[in-house]
UniProtKB/Swiss-Prot annotation:
GO terms under cellular component: cytosolic large ribosomal subunit
Pfam families for the chain: Ribosomal_L35p
Name of the gene: rpmI
UniProt keywords, alphabetically: Ribonucleoprotein, Ribosomal protein
Organism field: Synechococcus sp. (strain CC9311)
Descriptive protein name: Large ribosomal subunit protein bL35
Amino acid sequence: MPKLKTRKAAAKRFKATGTGKFMRRRAFHNHLLDHKTPKQKRHLKTKAVVDRTDEERVTLMMPYA
């Protein structure tokens, strides 16, 4: 059986944790930041855990993570 390929787009966006979960960046922290409060921007800077409903899809895209 051939080796499975990693989806490079997913590899750039997600990082596996030691427990097997995946971390992701938050949306809405790219541009149009003038009207957002400093607290909101600070919160958007932090990483988030991928939801359990999406974990299987990310795992399929990154088989060796």
